[in-house]
Amino acid sequence: MSSRVCYHINGPFFIIKLIDPKHLNSLTFEDFVYIALLLHKANDIDSVLFTVLQSSGKYFSSGGKFSAVNKLNDGDVTSEVEKVSKLVSAISSPNIFVANAFAIHKKVLVCCLNGPAIGLSASLVALCDIVYSQNDSVFLLFPFSNLGFVAEVGTSVTLTQKLGINSANEHMIFSTPVLFKELIGTIITKNYQLTNTETFNEKVLQDIKQNLEGLYPKSVLGMKELLHSEMKQKLIKAQAMETNGTLPFWASGEPFKRFKQLQEGNRRHKL
């Protein structure tokens, strides 16, 4: 369980909701793992056709909690082996577990993007099959190079596939935000132009229910499996490449230094 993430089932919907708007829905590593566990739970429920990611407040999620990341660097490490083992356990394993849960998910993944999403949270948005935006103030930011490491949780695949290689190069290399005008038609399929997040969340569910009328449920899931098959294989392959690529950066200590600067207000994202 998490105080920042909850879930409930509503007919064909398994709804996962971020519920800490006071802290811009920032998440710990345990929260990301919990979301992955909920995806597995949704997979096992026959009546569920859609897994829906919702949020609350003005931000979808500001990404990982600075304090949670910096906590991983606490304590003395006596050897290089101990340091790497600790990082594999605390960072590499959760990243692989979360990315794999999204890659192999059988239900249609829908994201109700109510506001900006940053870091690993933005990576989850990019992994969804269908993304709806509340209004045109949303953006995605993948500040990995600004934080001292490289692409994680499938972004080396999702962004190149959905935004195109040149745009992905620019945003990933320079850690610049992907604004609404570029997201619409690539990652976002529809903009609801609403101001209230709860109204937006409910409207998306109503529209999906209406669109489901007359459809054969097994065809819905079969279509997801067919359309996602190529992406699924690419994501599974990317997990090893991304994890092995980013681990040396974490081992160098640079990301911890930069997260601490963010926490102390001495570093900012390019918003």
Curated annotation (Swiss-Prot):
Expression triggers: By oleate, through the binding of the OAF1-PIP2 transcriptional activator complex to its promoter ORE element. Expression is also induced during ammonia pulses in yeast colonies, at the beginning of detectable ammonia production.
Catalytic activity annotation: a (3E,5Z)-dienoyl-CoA = a (2E,4E)-(5,6-saturated)-dienoyl-CoA
Keyword Isomerase: yes
UniProt keyword Acyltransferase, yes or no: no
Listed EC numbers: 5.3.3.21
Active site positions, chain numbering: 152 (proton donor/acceptor)
UniProt motif (Peroxisome targeting signal (PTS1)) ranges: 269-271
GO CC term (a single one): peroxisomal matrix
Database matches in InterPro entries: ClpP/crotonase-like_dom_sf, ECH/Chromodomain_protein, Enoyl-CoA_hydra/iso
Example GO biological process: fatty acid beta-oxidation
Pathway in which the depicted protein is active: Lipid metabolism; fatty acid beta-oxidation
Pfam families: ECH_1
EC class of the enzyme, as a word: isomerase
CDD domains: crotonase-like
Protein's cellular compartments: Peroxisome
Residues the entry annotates as binding substrate: 62-66, 120
Keywords: Fatty acid metabolism, Isomerase, Lipid metabolism, Peroxisome
Family: Belongs to the enoyl-CoA hydratase/isomerase family.
Quaternary state and interactors: Interacts with ECI1.
Protein name in UniProt: Delta(3,5)-Delta(2,4)-dienoyl-CoA isomerase
Upper lineage: Eukaryota, Fungi, Dikarya, Ascomycota, Saccharomycotina
